[in-house]
């Protein structure tokens, strides 16, 4: 994957209809650049309060819905109309607020599988191994962010 380190590289990709925030096969982003762009697009999820966080969350969920396929990543069932319930955080917003608006931290799941991920046996889910790799990647990147 190509490592994006500045805004010009990011904009170049966007102009060519690539989305480095989601396209992990082709791109990696410097974590500082990723966080800067996420804050611009969705707002400050960590430092905001009340209505600001709710508005930022709504912008984020709608953006994810617009940029990811409208099917459950677990059972592949088509999902017709937008609902924030379909956007399932891999790592919870409460425990990892700095990752709340990272699109890599979201699975599109039907209500049943969203509930399974939150409250059921995650290890039996088809998405489990991919999510574990994503958790490791995100935790390492955000840990590096704190060192700067």
Describe each region flagged by the PLM.
Residues 11, 70, 108:
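Cys/His-enriched microdomains
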Residues 17, 23-74, 97-100:
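Short, charged surface segments at domain edges that flank catalytic/cofactor-binding sites
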Residues 130-148:
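Charged phosphate-binding loop/patch that engages nucleotide di/tri-phosphates or the phosphate backbone
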């Amino acid at each position: 994957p190509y490592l994006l380190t500045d805004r010009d590289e990011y904009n170049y990709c966007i102009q060519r209809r690539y989305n480095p925030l989601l396209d992990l096969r082709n791109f990696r982003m410097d974590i500082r650049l990723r966080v800067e762009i996420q804050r611009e697009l969705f707002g400050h999820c960590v430092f905001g309060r009340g209505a600001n966080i709710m508005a930022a969350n709504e912008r984020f969920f709608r953006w994810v819905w617009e940029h990811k396929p409208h099917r459950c990543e677990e059972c592949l069932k088509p999902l017709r109309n937008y609902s924030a319930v379909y956007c399932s955080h891999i790592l919870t917003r409460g425990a990892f607020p700095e990752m709340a608006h990272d699109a890599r931290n979201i699975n599109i799941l039907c209500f049943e599988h969203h509930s399974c991920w939150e409250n059921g046996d995650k290890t039996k889910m088809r998405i489990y191994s991919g999510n574990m790799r994503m958790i490791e990647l995100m935790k390492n990147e955000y840990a590096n962010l704190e060192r700067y």
